[in-house]
Amino acid sequence: MKILQVGLGNNPGGMEAFVMNYFRELAKQGITFDFVCMYHKIAYEEEIRQLGGRVFYVPNVKKDYFGYVKAFLELLQREQYDIIHVNMLSAANIVPLRLAKKVGGGKVIAHSHNASAPGTLRKILDRLNRP
């Protein structure tokens, strides 16, 4: 089984530590995790590679939206994941979810970390994009 983790950054605590705890255990069962990162570095990169995972760097969606979309779509089409787990700060960040749905294939898990989003537009998007 191949799982793609989206939305983790270079902070070795919080969600990154949580996901790595799962990865350490699931890797023993032959489950593969790959990671998409739009920052210059991802936390635990060396350990990810030691456990058989891969890290794919894509452009930052805020700085290069079209570059992000192109790179993310190419990755999804090439790798064919069973599960795509999207970690996001609010439900307003729907770009990776929409792209995963467009490509199809695996199940998509949306994991939002905040109960609310600041700013009027973000609040509207947050509300509209909740299940």
Predicted regions: what they are:
Residues 1-131:
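Membrane-interface segments of envelope glycosyltransferases acting on lipid-linked substrates or membrane lipids
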